[in-house]
Amino acid sequence: QDAAKGEALFKQCQTCHRADKNMVGPALAGVVGRKAGTAPGFSYSPLNHAAGEAGLVWSQENVVEYLADPNAFLKKFLTDKGQADKATGSTKMTFKLANEQQRKDVAAYLATLK
């Protein structure tokens, strides 16, 4: 995991995200360690809210999996928690990052944002 490479890759994310302010996507400073769906002032999808209420806390590992397929990750999380009935709809995030090493690098960078 290379946070410097992740910072460079994060430029792709800046269409929707910033570290310090909500845009189309939530502010990402402090995301690692934060409960899903809880960035102050951001209007999340019901799917994101449900995952947070079911106990999803963003770890680097969760971020790596999420970036591969956000909707599939959240739906699997809810289903694994016995809440398949809440695993409906979709997250606002449609971007997917196929390369696992790149996902790890981005997650490492996000972990540096406080």
Swiss-Prot record:
Cystines in this chain: none
Post-translational modification note: Binds 1 heme c group covalently per subunit.
InterPro entries, alphabetized: Cyt_c-like_dom (IPR009056), Cyt_c-like_dom_sf (IPR036909), Cyt_c_1A/1B (IPR002327)
Gene Ontology MF: a single term: heme binding
A single GO cellular-component term on record: periplasmic space
Primary location recorded for the protein, binned into one broad class: periplasm
Sequence positions bearing Pyrrolidone carboxylic acid: Q1
Residues reported to bind heme c: C13, C16, H17, M93
Function: Cytochrome c2 is found mainly in purple, non-sulfur, photosynthetic bacteria where it functions as the electron donor to the oxidized bacteriochlorophyll in the photophosphorylation pathway. However, it may also have a role in the respiratory chain and is found in some non-photosynthetic bacteria.
Family: Belongs to the cytochrome c family.
Protein name: Cytochrome c2
